[in-house]
Amino acid sequence: MITNQMAGPRKQLKAVFWLLCIVAGSLSFPYEAFCEAPDPYAAARQRMVDRQLKARDITDSKVLEVMGTVKRHLFLSGRYGSQAYADHPLPIGEGQTISQPYIVALMTQILDVKPGEKVLEIGTGSGYQAAVLSHFTDQVWSVEIRKELAQKASERLKTLGYERIKAKHGDGYFGWPEYAPFDAIMVTAAANHVAPPLLDQLKMGGRLLIPLGSTTYYQTLTKITKTPKGKEVEHLLGVVFVPMVGKILEE
């Protein structure tokens, strides 16, 4: 009898739930966390936040919240999805990787993006970092030099509801001048110098984050702030990133 009595209300609640999903989708809201079935990776994602981020030096509450919200496993394919919350980078195809969760969180924390700021990412990759950044501002642009990765990332971001992120295939060396200047630029590939167009497209007082150094061994994560006198440079920590390719290699 109890089961029969509950059946009607449960069906009604389910109908309301999916109606809300449809409405959220029509508003271009990042609704993947709301509309999907119970997330089998929720516990793994929380462990990642607790053990890899909080246990280190990720202290920004907003960064921790976003890292615990964005479903990293949806940005990976095949067998790598089950390893999404492990403490290391993972392959995404074409010799590229998705950075380990700690590095994504750290770079996001260092860049310190505020609501309404314009952010340019160089190296879309899987689209995960752009998705994370979009929770801080609704003005995110991203450039990926590898055409297939760019197409997959764009499709993935739209499917997951991140339609406000503007992504394109192109050489990140040249930035995205049509939308410049930017408050912040994040480069997610290693280079031995900063591409001049990127500095040109940075607002006065804006900051640029990039792994600088050898493109075959390791680099130093470096923060550059544009000032009236030129730039302020902060060398932060040693990292290992895949190399930036394209025009940058000709200089």
Per-region residue spans from a language model:
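Class I SAM-dependent transferase core
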Residues: 33-120, 131-132, 136, 149-151, ...
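N-terminal alpha-helical modules
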Residues: 2, 9, 27, 33-37
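Bacterial N-terminal signal peptides
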Residues: 17-28
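General helical secondary-structure elements
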Residues: 6, 10, 41-43, 47, ...
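Conserved nucleotide-cofactor-binding alpha/beta core module
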Residues: 112-232
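Bacterial N-terminal signal peptides that target proteins for export
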Residues: 2-19
